[in-house]
Design a protein with these regions (language model features):
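Short, low-complexity N-terminal intrinsically disordered segments enriched in polar/charged residues
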Residues: 1-33, 48-51
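A contiguous, well-structured "functional interface" segment within a domain
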Residues: 1-7, 64, 115-122
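Surface-exposed, charged secondary-structure patches
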Residues: 4-10, 36-97
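Short beta-strand segments enriched in hydrophobic/aromatic residues
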Residues: 31, 91, 117-118
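Short secondary-structure capping/turn micro-motifs that flank functional sites
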Residues: 35-36, 122
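Short beta-strand edge/turn micro-motifs at domain boundaries
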Residues: 97-124
Length: 124
């Protein structure tokens, strides 16, 4: 299936929908294949490849299927030019609530996430 990647906003929505639905196909369209995910835990930097992350997504039960309400929204979009955007979003995979920092670039095939760094808190 082909998804809209004509704008950074469309890719952000695709990303948020993919997370809420645990839809690896949507997330795969939002991310560039060379992207990775980075987070800090116990004083250490952790790095996960895009392919390994999608495999984890495929194993999850989605918040949507569990009847959880959506907790996702865009906090900021900062564009340095017509081809690069830095986006901060809030989202949830209960009981974890995330702040994601996404770098998007407009490539020949459209906008894609090329890097993701995040932090999360656990709530009961």
């Amino acid at each position: 299936m082909s998804y809209d990647r004509s704008t950074a906003e469309a890719v952000i929505q695709l990303y948020l929908d993919g997370l809420y639905e645990c839809d690896a196909d949507k997330l795969g369209q939002a991310f560039h294949p060379s992207a990775d995910l980075r987070w800090h835990e116990k004083g250490e930097l952790n790095v996960l490849s895009y392919a390994d992350w999608l495999e984890r997504v495929r194993q999850r039960t989605s918040p949507k299927s569990q009847g959880h309400p959506r907790h996702d929204f865009v906090v900021t979009v900062d564009r340095s030019d017509e081809t690069t955007a830095f986006v901060k979003v809030k989202c949830a995979l209960p009981p974890r609530f995330f702040t994601d920092y996404l770098v998007l670039m407009k490539l020949n095939s459209g906008w894609q996430v090329v890097s993701k760094s995040y932090r999360y808190e656990t709530h009961d």
